[in-house]
């Protein structure tokens, strides 16, 4: 029986939160940790060995490794990069500091001969996913930036609190940038099979307030504990689970919605063993559509500047 192997690149708070979530769920048989600071990957590997010993579904191997370990991996998860600074730094303001890191990672992963699925959480995640995909030349569907999966989870939670229902019974998505230009798609939200608008009507001002709460959640967390990691760690494990078990489940990840574009952007799509496919056909209201287009245009502009600053000549 083939073992399920993941290589984690970036052993900071986000990477290790993913690792802990994945280990608890018994997702992989082999875990390989890589970090620019070798002692960090070694120390975490040893620490997780101890946790693994008492897990109900222990992994067969947890070790610190190198990019050569990517060659036969099923999934590579990338969380490396510098985090947002407290005080309101946006994800897009991180781009200059993280693009060069992602370019180097992408080159190393490609050179290893890796042919699996890549899941990315490094911020700004849509831009980092776009850089990674273009540098590697991997099939677009095999690159899965986390997109708006965390934003959508936050929206689910905020709406569910207000209508007093389990979030699992609510289907509602955030689309666009994983960041300040995202759009909460209330028009397509549903409770069970019932449109949210028929289950509980929210005014436009209430919707704006909910969306603001969703968008400010990350800043609230960063300003109080310096970083977000448990939420996104759980989201990364959820994406990996969908890939490993070929669930073909709809998740709001970052995808190349336009085949002729290099831009990855948050949108619900089916996720399974071959990556993402079959983007959901959402009928957006005019205001939602304008917001999504504005978000796309913003990401496109940032990516073009980023690509040029990396010394690439296509733009």
From Swiss-Prot:
Positions bound to NAD(+): 14, 35, 67, 81-82, 121-123, 146
Catalyses which reaction(s): (S)-lactate + NAD(+) = pyruvate + NADH + H(+)
Keyword Cytoplasm: yes
Subcellular location(s) per record: Cytoplasm
Biological-process GO terms, alphabetical: glycolytic process; lactate metabolic process
Active site: 178
Top-tier EC class: oxidoreductase
Record EC number: 1.1.1.27
Binding site for substrate: 84, 91, 123-126, 151-154, 228
Keywords: Cytoplasm, NAD, Oxidoreductase, Phosphoprotein
Recorded metabolic or biological pathway in which this protein acts: Fermentation; pyruvate fermentation to lactate; (S)-lactate from pyruvate: step 1/1
Annotated CDD domains: HicDH_like
Entry's Gene Ontology molecular function annotations: L-lactate dehydrogenase activity
Entry annotated with the keyword Transferase: no
Modified residues annotated as Phosphotyrosine in this record: 219
GO terms under cellular component: cytoplasm
Protein family membership: Belongs to the LDH/MDH superfamily. LDH family.
Function: Catalyzes the conversion of lactate to pyruvate.
Assembly: Homotetramer.
UniProt-recorded name of the protein: L-lactate dehydrogenase
Species this chain originates from: Malacoplasma penetrans (strain HF-2) (Mycoplasma penetrans)
Gene from which the chain derives: ldh
């Amino acid at each position: 029986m083939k073992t399920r192997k993941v290589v984690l690149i970036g052993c900071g708070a986000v990477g290790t939160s993913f690792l802990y979530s994945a280990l608890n769920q018994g997702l992989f048989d082999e875990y390989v940790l890589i970090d620019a600071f070798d002692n960090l990957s070694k120390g975490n590997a040893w620490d997780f060995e101890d946790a693994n010993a008492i897990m109900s579904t222990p992994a067969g191997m947890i070790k610190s490794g190198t990019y050569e370990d990517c060659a036969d991996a099923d999934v590579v998860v990338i969380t490396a990069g510098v985090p947002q600074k407290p005080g309101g730094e946006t994800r897009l303001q991180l781009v200059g500091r993280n693009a060069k890191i992602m370019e180097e990672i992408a080159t190393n992963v490609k050179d290893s001969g890796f042919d699996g699925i890549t899941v990315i959480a490094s911020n700004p995640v849509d831009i980092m996913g776009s850089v990674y995909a273009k540098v590697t030349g991997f099939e677009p569907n095999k690159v899965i930036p986390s997109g708006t999966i965390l934003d959508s989870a936050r929206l689910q939670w905020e709406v569910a609190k207000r209508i007093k229902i389990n979030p699992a019974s609510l289907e509602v998505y955030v689309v666009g940038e994983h960041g300040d230009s995202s759009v909460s798609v209330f028009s397509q939200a549903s409770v069970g099979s019932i449109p949210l608008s028929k289950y509980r009507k929210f005014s436009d001002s209430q919707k704006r307030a909910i969306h603001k709460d969703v968008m400010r959640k990350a800043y609230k967390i960063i300003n109080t504990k310096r970083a977000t990691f448990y939420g996104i760690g759980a989201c990364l494990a959820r994406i990996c689970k969908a890939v490993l078990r070929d669930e073909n489940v709809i998740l709001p990840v970052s995808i190349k919605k336009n085949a002729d574009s290099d831009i990855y952007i948050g949108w619900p799509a089916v996720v399974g063993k071959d990556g993402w496919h079959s983007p959901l056909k959402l009928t957006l209201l005019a205001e939602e559509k304008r917001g999504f287009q504005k978000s796309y245009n913003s990401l496109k502009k940032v990516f073009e500047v980023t690509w040029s600053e990396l010394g690439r000549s296509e733009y």
